[in-house]
A protein has these predicted regions:
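Phosphodiester-processing cores and adjacent nucleic acid-binding clamps
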Residues: 1-248
Length: 248
């Protein structure tokens, strides 16, 4: 496998048009499910990176029913101090992905997500590095940094000042989606001598689904197609079709 398929489902509200429905094949006029895509590519594992916890039960049940190994990760916003709820604190925001290795890892994810959604909430669920380290266990959790919106990306391209506490082993996803700044981020990661995993974020099935995906995002954010105001939305490469082409 040349690059890892990182799926996201419609449970990450407004971020994907793929569902977690248990069905044999995708058909016209109905939303595409992730599972027939896995079947097409003869994949026995699902790498699912979500922005919201609500889809875990369906993902876990359907993976078990279909004999698919679930690798479940949540994308978190991390800041310097979750107690600082002011505009300046937003300059330290960046994204990480935390994967659960086992049942105890799932329970730790619940704790992290609950804290971020309640005590840490400021415009969105947030946690900080101290809380993350307090709940962390290397036996149960795995840390990764997404290609987009990580501390590397934000410090390099958005003038933010993100200071991560890299207290545990971790790796970085590396992507190429034909965006103008992909090479800039890629060159920076390569210069850091870090553990890289080639990956492809997948939000829809085919390239010609991109207009439907963009429309869905506009509806979710109450914007318009003429002025969507979304980052990273000038490419139709975030799809399963592109992943298959890259993997032969």
């Amino acid at each position: 496998m040349l690059c890892l398929p990182l799926f996201k489902s419609h449970f990450s509200f407004g971020r994907s048009i793929l569902t977690l429905e248990n069905k044999e094949e995708n058909t016209d006029n109905f939303p595409d499910s992730i599972f027939p895509l896995l079947k097409q590519a003869e994949l026995k594992e699902l790498f699912l990176v979500e922005d919201h916890f609500s889809g875990f039960l369906q993902a876990n049940k359907n993976c078990a029913d279909l004999g698919v190994k679930l690798n479940y990760g949540l994308r978190f916003t991390v800041c310097d101090d979750f107690k600082d709820k002011n505009e300046d604190s937003l300059n330290s925001n960046s994204k990480i992905v935390v994967f659960a290795k086992n049942l105890k890892g799932y329970k730790r994810l619940v704790k992290l997500y609950t804290h971020a959604s309640t005590e840490g909430f400021y415009y969105e669920p947030r946690t900080d590095w101290m809380v993350l380290q307090k709940i962390w266990s290397d036996k149960d959790l795995l840390m990764a940094f997404p290609f987009y919106d990580s501390y590397v990306f934000n410090n390099l391209l958005t003038n933010k000042i993100c200071q991560p506490d890299l207290f545990t082993d971790h790796f970085y996803f590396h992507e190429d989606n034909d965006l103008p700044f992909d090479d800039i981020v890629s060159n920076k990661l390569n210069s850091m001598d870090v553990n890289l995993i080639n990956a492809k974020s997948i939000y829809y099935a085919k390239k010609n689904d991109f207009p439907a995906y963009l429309t869905f995002r506009c509806m979710s954010k109450r914007t318009t197609l003429s002025k969507p105001n979304f980052e990273h939305m000038s490419s139709d490469e975030f799809c399963f079709e592109s992943w298959r082409q890259a993997n032969g």
